[in-house]
């Protein structure tokens, strides 16, 4: 009887240890601390001028990002590695009580790049010059925290978990021997650190993809006629395998929605 109890205790301990290990290796994305920056706006009152952008998301309305988006300065954009990240911003009413909406806040998704303008001083028009942390926000988002006539306001900002509806989506573009995969609707960290692809043919292994631009990842393999799986690692270290998310009948230009999402 004592022997059985001992075996049960060992099994229970091992099971608990495995569960604990899983929970510590895959933790939910947590918000960062607050930092100071500045914010302007662009794109018009309906944000129609924000479509496209350096992340490659295209139509932000149909992609689900809407009008709460922003172009990031060089210091924040990180050559596209920040595409899809979410930031909470609040206007610093103590620093600018005239143009700030005190107590208001808004969360935006990084969808574009705000290029530097070295012809202008960083504190007088060159708002996106390094090393300034600056957000050029879609106008509807900016007007939630600032008064239109102000034009530019001081802000406090921090990264926060992205909340998305549905699973991660993959749009396959390109041509033979050049698959360009746009990754959208990423929750939690919002941005992708690395990505791999595997075809469905027997013996196929995982092949590393590289960031082409923005949220677009490329492969130089010949994958036509194969079902595709992706192994995606977000910038917080979470990894998900999207097994068979793209069927063998895929064609360039199609988008495939998964049922899996980051936490």
UniProtKB/Swiss-Prot annotation:
One protein family per Pfam: Expansin_C
Q: Which Gene3D superfamilies match?
A: Expansin, cellulose-binding-like domain (2.60.40.760), RlpA-like domain (2.40.40.10)
Q: Where is the Expansin-like EG45 domain?
A: 52-167
Please tell me the species this chain comes from: Oryza sativa subsp. japonica
- The entry's keywords: Cell wall, Cell wall biogenesis/degradation, Membrane, Secreted, Signal
Q: Which gene encodes it?
A: EXPA29
Q: Which family does it belong to?
A: Belongs to the expansin family. Expansin A subfamily.
GO CC annotation: what is one?
A: extracellular region
* Name the UniProt record assigns to this protein: Expansin-A29
- Subcellular localization: Secreted, Cell wall; Membrane
Q: Where is the Expansin-like CBD domain?
A: 177-258
The protein's job, in short, is: May cause loosening and extension of plant cell walls by disrupting non-covalent bonding between cellulose microfibrils and matrix glucans. No enzymatic activity has been found. May be required for rapid internodal elongation in deepwater rice during submergence.
Membrane topology recorded in Swiss-Prot or TrEMBL: Peripheral membrane protein
Tissue distribution: Expressed in panicles and flowers.
Its chief place of residence is: secreted
Single Gene Ontology BP annotation: plant-type cell wall loosening
- Position of the signal peptide: 1-28
């Amino acid at each position: 009887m004592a022997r059985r109890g001992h075996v049960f205790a060992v099994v229970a301990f091992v099971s608990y240890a495995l569960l604990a290990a899983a929970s510590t290796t895959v933790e939910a994305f947590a918000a960062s601390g607050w930092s100071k920056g500045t914010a302007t706006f662009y794109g018009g009152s309906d944000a129609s001028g924000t479509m496209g952008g350096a992340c490659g998301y295209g139509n932000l309305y149909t992609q689900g990002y809407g009008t709460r988006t922003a172009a990031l300065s060089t210091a924040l954009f990180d050559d596209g590695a920040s595409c899809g990240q979410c930031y909470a911003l609040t206007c610093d009413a103590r620093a600018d009580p005239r143009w700030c909406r005190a107590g208001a806040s808004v969360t935006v998704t990084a969808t574009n790049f705000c290029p530097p303008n070295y012809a202008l001083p960083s504190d007088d028009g060159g708002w996106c010059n390094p090393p300034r942390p600056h957000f050029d926000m879609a106008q509807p988002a900016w007007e939630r925290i600032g008064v239109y006539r102000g034009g530019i306001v001081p802000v406090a900002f921090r990264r926060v978990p992205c909340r998305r509806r549905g699973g991660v989506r993959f749009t396959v573009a390109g041509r033979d021997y050049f698959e360009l995969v746009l990754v959208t609707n990423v929750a939690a960290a919002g941005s992708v650190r690395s990505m791999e692809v595997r075809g469905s043919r027997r013996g196929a292994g995982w092949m590393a993809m590289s960031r082409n631009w923005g949220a677009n990842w490329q492969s130089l393999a010949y994958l036509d006629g194969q079902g595709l799986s992706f192994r995606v690692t977000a910038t917080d270290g979470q990894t998900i395998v999207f097994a068979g998310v793209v069927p063998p009948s895929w064609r360039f230009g199609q988008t495939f929605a998964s049922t899996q999402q980051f936490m």
